[in-house]
Amino acid sequence: MIHGIGVDLIEIDRIQALYSKQPKLVERILTKNEQHKFNNFTHEQRKIEFLAGRFATKEAFSKALGTGLGKHVAFNDIDCYNDELGKPKIDYEGFIVHVSISHTEHYAMSQVVLEKSAF
């Protein structure tokens, strides 16, 4: 049974501007695992695209959950990783989480579908 669907779209330039002013933005948005992946990218633009994609994913996840970001769930509570095929995944107790992330030159977007787990 579907619990919720969330979608988020972010301008990559907006994330670039925030990152330029606040380098600690990475620590605020990304988990330790995500930070490790971020730091392994050699091209600065790819880092920003990754950061924007994860930002959009976490926003979309919180919308699907129905809480938004803040009191009930924070950026660092949501760890988005890639499986062996490269598919983005989020583990969250009680739910099966379906994630899609996409980028263009100017935008990053993510859609998250939360399905109640039968177990």
Swiss-Prot record:
<protein>
    <recommendedName>
        <fullName>Holo-[acyl-carrier-protein] synthase</fullName>
        <ecNumber>2.7.8.7</ecNumber>
    </recommendedName>
</protein>
<comment type="function">
    <text>Transfers the 4'-phosphopantetheine moiety from coenzyme A to a Ser of acyl-carrier-protein.</text>
</comment>
<dbReference type="GO" id="GO:0008897">
    <property type="term" value="F:holo-[acyl-carrier-protein] synthase activity"/>
</dbReference>
<keyword id="KW-0479">Metal-binding</keyword>
<dbReference type="InterPro" id="IPR008278">
    <property type="entry name" value="4-PPantetheinyl_Trfase_dom"/>
</dbReference>
<comment type="similarity">
    <text>Belongs to the P-Pant transferase superfamily. AcpS family.</text>
</comment>
<dbReference type="Pfam" id="PF01648">
    <property type="entry name" value="ACPS"/>
</dbReference>
<keyword id="KW-0275">Fatty acid biosynthesis</keyword>
<keyword id="KW-0443">Lipid metabolism</keyword>
<dbReference type="InterPro" id="IPR002582">
    <property type="entry name" value="ACPS"/>
</dbReference>
<dbReference type="InterPro" id="IPR037143">
    <property type="entry name" value="4-PPantetheinyl_Trfase_dom_sf"/>
</dbReference>
<keyword id="KW-0276">Fatty acid metabolism</keyword>
<dbReference type="InterPro" id="IPR004568">
    <property type="entry name" value="Ppantetheine-prot_Trfase_dom"/>
</dbReference>
<keyword id="KW-0444">Lipid biosynthesis</keyword>
<keyword id="KW-0963">Cytoplasm</keyword>
<keyword id="KW-0808">Transferase</keyword>
<dbReference type="GO" id="GO:0005737">
    <property type="term" value="C:cytoplasm"/>
</dbReference>
<dbReference type="GO" id="GO:0000287">
    <property type="term" value="F:magnesium ion binding"/>
</dbReference>
<keyword id="KW-0460">Magnesium</keyword>
<feature type="binding site">
    <location>
        <position position="8"/>
    </location>
    <ligand>
        <name>Mg(2+)</name>
    </ligand>
</feature>
<feature type="binding site">
    <location>
        <position position="59"/>
    </location>
    <ligand>
        <name>Mg(2+)</name>
    </ligand>
</feature>
<dbReference type="GO" id="GO:0006633">
    <property type="term" value="P:fatty acid biosynthetic process"/>
</dbReference>
